[in-house]
From Swiss-Prot:
Residues 1-78 are annotated as: Disordered. One of its GO terms (biological process) is vesicle tethering to Golgi. One of its GO terms (cellular component) is Golgi apparatus. Residues 9-24 have a biased composition (Acidic residues). Keywords: Cytoplasmic vesicle, Golgi apparatus, Phosphoprotein. As component of the WDR11 complex acts together with TBC1D23 to facilitate the golgin-mediated capture of vesicles generated using AP-1. May have a role in spermatogenesis. The modification Phosphoserine is found at residues 8, 18. It comes from Homo sapiens (Human). The lineage of its organism: Eukaryota, Metazoa, Chordata, Craniata, Vertebrata. Component of the complex WDR11 composed of C17orf75, FAM91A1 and WDR11; FAM91A1 and WDR11 are required for proper location of the complex. Interacts with TBC1D23; this interaction may be indirect and recruits TBC1D23 to AP-1-derived vesicles. This is Protein Njmu-R1. It is found in: Golgi apparatus, trans-Golgi network; Cytoplasmic vesicle. PANTHER family: PROTEIN NJMU-R1. The keyword Phosphoprotein applies.
């Protein structure tokens, strides 16, 4: 196991649980999709600050559950699957955030909401958005004079857990807007289905991929880390979306220079001339042209260990740790290479690091692309490539 990898995973699990403290042991575990909730509100009026003795954390505890009154402010329930006794408390919480000007159109927020049901502390994602069309149940006399605005809330897991998926939830809201603008029949039921599926569609894909591939997950991790193209065959659309989502989240896109990533993708494509092919025609997916290394194998085991707890939020945290460790190793290698340009002992340290880190094959390709225009570094990398090739030949 990589140094501190297991400790990191254990720590993340404890953090995710402690962020939901106050509930029972069962509540601190992942809530199944059936207990995730949503609320859709229509919003009309000014977002001028109306300070009403808000608590520091915006908690609705000890406040009236009714929407703040006033001709310039209206927050009306359009649809929800929350229990009726809980929804007014959530509405009060959202109304406070709106009145303080703390919510901006199209940018989701994540908070922890403590409702009056004993021990019910839950993560809440909420987002304000404008839409061209009004839902039938939200049409009023003043609708034509005001832009149609809505606030959507997704509740489930913990604040820390939902924060990991905030960007995906922002994209999910864009999908909701597209659905609301459709002319299709049965629009209301379609939107209701879309809202109620948020947990399954946004939070659970990584978990489903881990459970599907098991030990073969190492091939998927290696493909994501090395920017190797992946082709999925004989698969249903849901599984294909899950795999593509996993690859997108697992890649280092956004964490390394965009030009480096583009060059690396081109280099990997030219070098291999083949994509990794995943055949899903049988119950156990089969891989062709797949690669792996010790680094990916160790992290695959971390995912399988996490599967025992059944927490999809933990899978996402492990995936984030996987990427951070890869970036850390890449930065360490760059530092060693800079030192090795003037120091033979540093060159040896560089070689030993590559040999022991578990992902030397991929890291060397990344830094090779980044240092393409630097002659001194290119010489060091050429020597390291020769050392690694000799070490590989001796291992057979």
């Amino acid at each position: 196991m990589l140094p501190s990898l297991q400790e990191s995973m254990d720590g993340d699990e404890k953090e995710l649980e402690s962020s939901e403290e106050g509930g029972s042991a069962e509540e601190r575990r992942l809530e199944p999709p059936s207990s995730s909730h949503y609320c859709l509100y229509s919003y009309r009026g000014s977002r001028l600050a109306q300070q009403r003795g808000d608590s520091e954390d915006g908690s609705p505890s000890g406040t009236n559950a009714e929407t703040p009154s006033g001709d310039d402010f209206s927050l009306s329930l359009a649809d929800t699957n929350l229990p009726s006794e809980v929804e007014p408390e959530l509405r009060s919480f959202i109304a406070k955030r709106l009145s303080r000007g703390a919510v901006f159109e199209g940018l989701g927020n994540v908070a922890s909401v403590e409702l009056k049901i004993p021990g019910y502390r839950v993560g809440c994602y909420y987002c304000l958005f404008q839409n061209e069309k009004l839902l039938p149940e939200t049409v009023t006399i003043d609708s034509e004079r005001n832009p149609s605005e809505y606030v959507v809330c997704f509740l489930g897991g913990s604040e820390k857990g939902l924060e990991l998926f905030r960007l995906e939830l922002d994209k999910y809201i864009q999908g909701l807007k597209n659905n609301m603008n459709c002319e299709a029949r049965g629009l209301e039921s379609h939107i209701k289905s879309y809202l109620s599926s948020w947990f399954e569609d946004v939070v659970c894909p990584i978990q489903r991929v881990v459970l599907l591939f098991q030990e073969k997950l190492t091939f998927l991790l290696h493909a994501a880390l090395s920017y190797t193209p992946v082709e999925v065959k004989e698969s249903d659309e849901k599984t294909k979306r899950d795999i593509n989502r996993f690859l997108s989240v697992a890649s280092l896109q956004g964490l390394i220079h965009e030009g480096t990533m583009t060059s690396l993708c081109m280099a990997m494509t030219e070098e291999q001339h083949k994509s990794v092919v995943i055949d899903c025609s049988s119950s156990q997916p089969q891989f062709c042209n797949a690669g792996s290394n010790r680094f990916c194998e160790d992290w695959m085991q971390a995912f399988l260990n996490g599967a025992k707890g059944g927490n999809p939020f933990l899978f996402r945290q492990v995936l984030e740790n996987f990427k951070l460790k890869a970036i850390q190793d890449t930065n360490n290698l760059k530092r060693f290479i800079r030192q090795a340009e003037m120091n033979h002992y540093a060159l040896f340290k560089c070689y030993m690091f590559l040999k022991n880190c578990g992902s030397g094959d991929i890291l060397l390709k990344i830094v090779k692309v980044e240092h393409e225009e630097m002659p001194e570094a290119k010489n060091v990398i050429a020597v390291l490539e020769e050392f690694m090739k000799e070490a590989l030949d001796q291992s057979f």
